[in-house]
Amino acid sequence: MANKLRKSNAIEWATATGTVPLLERSCCHSEDAALEPQASKTSHREQAPILRHLSQLSHLLIIAGLLIVCLAGVTEGRRHAPLMFEESDTGRRSNRPAVTECQFGKVLRELGSTWYADLGPPFGVMYCIKCECVAIPKKRRIVARVQCRNIKNECPPAKCDDPISLPGKCCKTCPGDRNDTDVALDVPVPNEEEERNMKHYAALLTGRTSYFLKGEEMKSMYTTYNPQNVVATARFLFHKKNLYYSFYTSSRIGRPRAIQFVDDAGVILEEHQLETTLAGTLSVYQNATGKICGVWRRVPRDYKRILRDDRLHVVLLWGNKQQAELALAGKVAKYTALQTELFSSLLEAPLPDGKTDPQLAGAGGTAIVSTSSGAASSMHLTLVFNGVFGAEEYADAALSVKIELAERKEVIFDEIPRVRKPSAEINVLELSSPISIQNLRLMSRGKLLLTVESKKYPHLRIQGHIVTRASCEIFQTLLAPHSAESSTKSSGLAWVYLNTDGSLAYNIETEHVNTRDRPNISLIEEQGKRKAKLEDLTPSFNFNQAIGSVEKLGPKVLESLYAGELGVNVATEHETSLIRGRLVPRPVADARDSAEPILLKRQEHTDAQNPHAVGMAWMSIDNECNLHYEVTLNGVPAQDLQLYLEEKPIEAIGAPVTRKLLEEFNGSYLEGFFLSMPSAELIKLEMSVCYLEVHSKHSKQLLLRGKLKSTKVPGHCFPVYTDNNVPVPGDHNDNHLVNGETKCFHSGRFYNESEQWRSAQDSCQMCACLRGQSSCEVIKCPALKCKSTEQLLQRDGECCPSCVPKKEAADYSAQSSPATNATDLLQQRRGCRLGEQFHPAGASWHPFLPPNGFDTCTTCSCDPLTLEIRCPRLVCPPLQCSEKLAYRPDKKACCKICPEGKQSSSNGHKTTPNNPNVLQDQAMQRSPSHSAEEVLANGGCKVVNKVYENGQEWHPILMSHGEQKCIKCRCKDSKVNCDRKRCSRSTCQQQTRVTSKRRLFEKPDAAAPAIDECCSTQCRRSRRHHKRQPHHQQRSSS
């Protein structure tokens, strides 16, 4: 086995998304000359050990790079593990059992494509690693896998002695050699002419067309038992490498759970799990029309060939994992009439007694109807059917084709064509006939019934109503002024679709359309310069929206809609066309399958060069948990643009905002997707407030912005928690740093971390944000002692009283109405601002210091004259007992007190207020014999708004650590010097002599020996140092 690996020079590493061969030799940095074999054998032997070590190091770097890039692919691959049947509808499940494209990092690669491995920084593009997306069969499925190999050994030998390595090349070349020696990459180039010719396809799915599902190898995978004779028809549109599909199914059965695309051999090429809930699909359009819509994105080149050669089959699956109910299949084929199709019909065998005639088992059909309502109106009918022939009718079989008004039993069309060679699977029959405008009107409203039966055996009959065509499509437009000189700010959007009964459902949204101008909204037909009004939609206009339906739609309107000649016009009393737009058809899938689009509005501060800029955006999340979006712009000049998704938890002041760049683009149209978006971000699209923004890439200016409606997220895309530790906003771990984005939500707005504010619910409460949680506390008013000339007064709107002159208090009490005088208003606005809080002149308050709350030991005041803020701290009285006996009555008490019965007189106590060298609790009460000016004039010192006399000593107080008793400061001739207390060796020896053995013999009433806390700490540190010293000396001597 080892020999085989050495011969192949590759080690295969299997992942969920592919088998990635890792090279056994370094090939990516070919410019390193040390890795190349030298011409001389002697030099080669000398460099062999170096090459071996460099090769091993290169292996590790390549493996690490591929692991990083493919890590996301591994996770995605596990999500898309192949499953034949759907799991429980309520749990997470894989929604793409067959994967027809490779995901390398976050880049999708087409099946059959090749590329150089890009490992990102710091490795970059590895030009000697060639990767390929290959098809690997796995349990009758084709699964795409990535395979990479070393192509350095495939380089041709250089024709010179000193070849060089060029940037972006793997193989070395000779200087001046213009021939490219690199291995050419096989990049499939699409043939535009080929794709233009393969656009419209259709399929009929009945029991008879599902013949290949009944083979011996397929019986274990599919159930074809169909007692109700369920049939279905499909339409396909191939557009820009994507295959859009639409299905009409029988009303006798519910919505299928999956769609498969298989080849002639029954190998599954692609499988899509359909979105189903208890109430049906989440799609508004599919619920309204009863259709099944979707798209197969990026069809590989090999599969396009299968589609072009009519070798592709489609399979509908019903049931679940426990029970497979039914599987219907049909061949996807081209039909010329599909290009002009206006109506469709699904033909089924009748069930008179709830049972199908055994001779009609597996019978069904579909009709492709094209009409023209000109001067000579006509109808073209293409029938695709089976099962209406007798056993002996094997040639030239006669049929009866009827179109009738079932309500009146009035036959409108009746012909008897003949089929030369009847087939048990597919028969195609084309008929044409003139038809009246009245009958076309009945056809457009779904009133006509089409019947195909055998002329010889009339009981062999299939029938169905003619309805709007089976294709899933909507028609949309942007509403904007058509004149560049227009000064209006009005804009809007419109989108419509056809129901099966022929009614036209419309949705119109406008912006800056004033109802006072009596707007008139109408459907118009635009043919050149002529504009004809067809329908008036004004009665349904309300609050900038017009939502409704046009029940009786004429054939002319229907033809104009499909031809792209129908538009929406908004007029006013002064302008016949304020804003308008022409409806354009779009297939329904992915982003356009959401509930409704959003209007991207021009911002007020936007540059005046884009006065009529407007946009429309669709956004949805598919069944594979990928985000899809589509943006259409109008009035935006050609430039490089950026599409951003903005998210905030709720619409509130100060809410945290996150922005994600979805894509950079240019032009007026963008259709894209975002793969592997985390579940936590997907759920925000449904639960949070989201905006879609279009920015200019160069100027960084916001051009358009629109608010997303609630985007529905499939249940299996929600985040899954594996334990009970569900994260709760506000939970925190003290060992972790506070996130800078942490905010608190209170009273309808957000506040930043450590921010303080007054509660909007109670203005006498102060709140603060700490670790994502808001805490509020009632304002504590300081105890005030007013002067004899002042009076305690509490004004309206203030939480605490303040001392004001008696005259001002009397005037305030006599005043019955609020101040209207300018002088009074100015006087009310006078005050001080501390932080973000305003305090009126003369007010006093305790500072709010979270998380401890109000500091009641400090009282701040706003000077009524100078508006200066002073915050002196409370001066504690001297203690009348030993400091060891003193205590604080509660945790927030400012001063210590002595226990009852422990006070001692000032004469008998060692510490007296007159001794400046002894410090008491917080500050000592000194006799105010001199003013501050006199103290400073006599050589005193001022430290932090506190005055010390010349020669006075004290311990400094730090706000974060309290009083520093081991540091002593002294004021000497207006200069402050601070020193830390130093302990001698004798002091430390004296401290250690007080042992526990001596304490046993001490009397209980004896005073405890004094222990200096500062010296004890220094002595312990010194002892530890001496204990370690012999060990170090021993190591040094050894």
Swiss-Prot record:
Gene Ontology annotations for the cellular component aspect, listed alphabetically: extracellular space; Golgi membrane; plasma membrane
Subcellular compartments: Golgi apparatus membrane; Cell membrane; Secreted
GO molecular function: BMP binding; collagen binding; growth factor activity; protein sequestering activity
Species of origin: Drosophila melanogaster
One Pfam match: VWC
Domain VWFC: 100-175, 742-804, 830-899, 939-1020
A GO biological process held by the record: dorsal/ventral pattern formation
Protein's recorded name: Dorsal-ventral patterning protein Sog
Transmembrane segments: 54-74
Family the UniProt entry places it in: Belongs to the chordin family.
Chain's role: Putative negative growth factor. Antagonist of dpp, a protein involved in patterning the dorsal region and in the development of the neuroectoderm; dpp inhibition is enhanced by tsg. Required for establishment of a narrow stripe of peak levels of BMP signaling in the dorsal midline of early embryos, that will give rise to the amnioserosa. During pupal development, plays a role in specification of the posterior crossvein in the wing. Exhibits both agonist and antagonist activities towards BMP signaling during pupal wing patterning.
Protein origin, superkingdom: Eukaryota
Chief location category: Golgi
SUPFAM superfamilies, per the entry: FnI-like domain
Annotated glycosylation sites: N179, N287, N520, N666, N752, N821
Segments on the Extracellular side according to the record's topology features: 75-1038
Keyword Zinc-finger: no
Subunit structure: Component of a complex composed of dpp, sog and tsg. Interacts with palmitoyltransferase Hip14.
Keywords: Cell membrane, Developmental protein, Glycoprotein, Golgi apparatus, Growth factor, Growth regulation, Lipoprotein, Membrane, Palmitate, Repeat, Secreted, Signal-anchor, Transmembrane, Transmembrane helix
Stretches in topological domain Cytoplasmic: 1-53
Residue stretches making up the CHRD domain: 197-337, 339-471, 474-588, 592-713
Post-translational modification note: Palmitoylated, probably by Hip14.
Membrane topology: Single-pass type II membrane protein; Single-pass type I membrane protein
Tissue: Abuts the dorsal dpp-expressing cells in a lateral stripe 14-16 cells wide. Later in embryogenesis it is expressed in neuroectoderm and in the endoderm spaced along the anterior-posterior axis of the developing gut.
